[in-house]
């Protein structure tokens, strides 16, 4: 592990964080821009791909996989169902649950999505060496570990707001 660079020429953490968050936001926007030719956004394409790859899945599982709330997922399923891309079928093991399946038209659209996805990924990787990719992956994994640790600890501000006073 390399020692932290605290020299004046090292970028500030604020600059790094702004770059990371801004890049993630632009990446999402660019992906949605590319998927517009399929009349999909990234969440819809992801949902279709999960259903295509894993078969009948319920709305709760799909919401978790896509990273959206159940209500948002339900609205997406409604939109995709109206377009004839997915179906809702009763779960044979639990009559309260509906499983989302994919139609032939939906499966064909997923194949087009995979082609757009592969092309897009090649474009964003342009000019980044293997060594740079390894460094980036290691740093992002370390940041992810730090974020996971934060999520496992109580928020100190929540404690003070619950009691009505700060400590």
Regions found by a protein language model. Give the residues of each.
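C-terminal regulatory/oligomerization modules of transcriptional regulators
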Residues: 1-10, 130-167
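Helix-turn-helix DNA-binding motif, specifically the short coil turn and the N-cap/start of the second
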Residues: 69-72
